[in-house]
């Protein structure tokens, strides 16, 4: 089984891949873990990890800067119902809109809004 960690220019991809590989080994799973920005790799994958580090806007821009990536993710998640795991800002992108820097459209897989926390 192929598990793709989507490389769209944000996140600590090496740490994520190593963590998944360790869990794979420790639990006798049979995943091949690949970090890739190639749309065809997403298409061929069995499971997808969408990491994210930084702002909502920067993350969605990273996805949109790779031709065909958002469309392929939508196809795999919404139509094929392929399992996807979001990490940090990667999961926030599942929402309709994010307001961290400015109003920014997300992937709209989960209806909702991501708002900036005012902690102080």
Language model segments and positions:
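Conserved hydrolase catalytic core segment
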Residues: 98-103
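Glycine-rich nucleophile elbow surrounding the catalytic serine of serine-hydrolase chemistry
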Residues: 88, 92-94
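Short, well-ordered secondary-structure micro-motifs
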Residues: 96-97, 119-120
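Short beta-strand-to-turn element immediately C-terminal to the catalytic PLP-Schiff-base lysine
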Residues: 95-96, 111
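N-terminal beta1-alpha1 cap of cysteine-dependent amidohydrolase-like domains
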Residues: 1-83, 89, 108-118
């Amino acid at each position: 089984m192929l598990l793709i960690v989507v490389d769209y220019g944000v996140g600590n991809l090496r740490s994520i891949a190593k963590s998944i590989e360790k869990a794979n080994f420790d639990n006798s799973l049979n995943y091949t873990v690949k970090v890739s920005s190639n749309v065809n790799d997403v298409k061929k994958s069995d499971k997808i990890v969408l990491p994210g580090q930084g702002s909502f806007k920067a993350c969605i821009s990273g996805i949109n800067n790779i031709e065909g990536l958002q469309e392929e993710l939508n196809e795999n998640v919404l139509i094929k119902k392929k399992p996807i795991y979001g990490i940090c800002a990667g999961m926030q992108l599942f929402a309709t809109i994010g307001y961290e820097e400015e109003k920014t459209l997300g992937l709209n897989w989960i209806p909702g809004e991501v708002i900036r926390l005012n902690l102080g």
